[in-house]
Amino acid sequence: MSLAGPTETNLGGHFPGTAVENGGSSSKRESSSPGFPRNSNASDKSVDYSRSRCSCRSPSSHYDYSEDFLSACSETTARNNYLEKPTVKEKKEKKKYNVSKISQLKGQKEISVRKKHSWNVPFLNSQISVAAQRRDAMIHRILSARLHKIKELKNELADLHHKAEATVIENQFLKQVQLKHLKAIGKYENSQNNLPQIMAKHQNEVKNLRQLLRKSQGKERATSRKLREMDGELLRTKDALQALQKISEENNLPEREELTQRLSILTAKMEANDKKIQDLEKQLRLNNKAFTRQLTFENRKTLAAQAATKTLQMEIKHLQQKLKEKDRELEIRNIYSNRIVGNLHDKEDYPKVSSTKSVQADRRSFPFISMRHQETQKSEDVASWTTKSKKTTGNNGHKEKSIEIIHAMPPCITKLPNQEDSKRKYEDLSKEEQHLEAQPSLKNTGQQRYRTENQEKKITLVKEEQELPPKRIEVIHPEGEGGQEDDTEKYKFKRSPEISDMGDMPDKNAAPHIKIPFRQRKHYSFTEAIENLHHGLPASGGLANAGSTRYPHSTGKHHSHSEEMKLEHPAIAYEPSFAKSYRTKAKDTTFREKKSNLMEELFGSDYVLKNNQTSTTVMKEPEETLQSTKIHHLPPSQASASNAFGDSGVTVVNSIKSSSPTEGNRKIII
């Protein structure tokens, strides 16, 4: 890189005037002084030398201290050149001055040449010296600025060289790191690609190792077996050796014949024992086969029995559902739904009575108005009261409920001579119930308060009955009251036209054509507690009149109308008088046998066992058979409530076919 170019450009840039003057003077010199070629050539040579020395340095060469030496040499040469240049310039100016003189001599012929020459010389010398001093100062400044700029440029070049070298080194390091990263990435990619192969190799190695383990374990087992066998053989040989040693040591040995006999006997015993063992093994096999056959046969039997039991259980459930439905229907049609209503003072002051007796009577013996009043209050009271009474009697779950429902049939079944009569009676019951279901039941929704009060009182009555001990109910034989029944029949015949007139009266709740049939009344006798309960009084209180306190809690028009009818028609008012019954000390075994047989046929042996346990605490009455036969021979319109009291908690009652659609037999549980 040459230094002449930048120096000239710098000089021209900083001092353009001087550059122009120098250019002009140089051109003048070249034109006016052709006789000074050596100085110019020498200066050019010096400048070229410095340029060549400067140009010899390559841009990529490192920084050396020789550069300062070269710069100092170039400065000295430049100064010498500039010192030589003013002398040349002075000579050139002299030549110009001479030329001007010549021109002046031509124009001014009058002035002499000597005078002019002596007058102009000091002036020119002073001007030349001043100009030379100025030029020297300017040149010195220009050279110092030039050198300073050159040094700055050199420093910048050195910095750039250092930066370039650092960048080259960094690039080399970065290339090395890049190569390392590329190698690592390649290894990672290769490892990812080779993962399945590596896994397969690993699995193969594991399989091989497992096979080797198995083989080694098998070998160890075989060697252990061999060792055991060898140990056994060694022990046997030792035993044999010991026996032989003992024999050899013994001196007094028996003869061979005896020994052979002993051996034969022992061998025979061994053979016999082997035969016995074989025979026993055969017997064991045969016995096992027989036992397996028996087990399979018994399993089949058990499966068949289980299937039969399942079917029977389904049938029992179906029958129980039917019985529940029949009981509900009978409870809805119960006569005593509104009868047992008493003036109870305090529920806690009276002792509680517990009994499960069913009462049954003919509805046609009641007065016409009370019958109408009962028809309005029959459905809701009975359902709630019976459910609550069942809850109080026992909380033993679904089994006791099913037993209680099954207990509904025994009185009807026991009063019949055989199973066919019971089936026939059950069919008649179902037909009559269907007939009654077809007829619409009349309800009065305006007496809900009265019903709730009756329900609460009935619950208290049930609790009182549960606490009291059960008492024997005496039933009077109907034949003993024959004269009274004849009198009542005559009185009924007299009062029949009045009843027919009453039937013609308009009534919204009753049917249009109601006929009250004539039938004999049966007189019954009860204990004080039961009589008080019938009259609606507490069990511990005194007796109450049957006619006056029958309906103490009836309200509204029905109450007043019923009282008027009782006053006008005292014969129509229902005054139950039950027949006396004679007690039997001996138990009726035939009755129990028939009952148990029928219950076995209908419900199975389990129920009979339970029923026998419950029936031991209940007394039987001989008149029940007579009443059952009478009921069997009587027509359904004249059937009475003779079978009201049985040995079970709930009884099933035949419904009575009456002329009116709302009349019928009802059942209640006390």
Curated annotation (Swiss-Prot):
One of its GO terms (cellular component) is axoneme. Disulfide bonds: none annotated. It holds the Pfam family Lebercilin. Residues 145-335, 418-468 form a coiled coil. Residues 1-63, 373-399, 413-453 are annotated as: Disordered. Keywords: Coiled coil. InterPro entries: Lebercilin-like, Lebercilin_dom. Residues 52-61 have a biased composition (Low complexity). Residues 418-436 have a biased composition (Basic and acidic residues). It comes from the Eukaryota. GO terms for biological process: intraciliary transport. Belongs to the LCA5 family. This is Lebercilin-like protein. It comes from Bos taurus. The lineage of its organism: Eukaryota, Metazoa, Chordata, Craniata, Vertebrata. The gene is LCA5L.
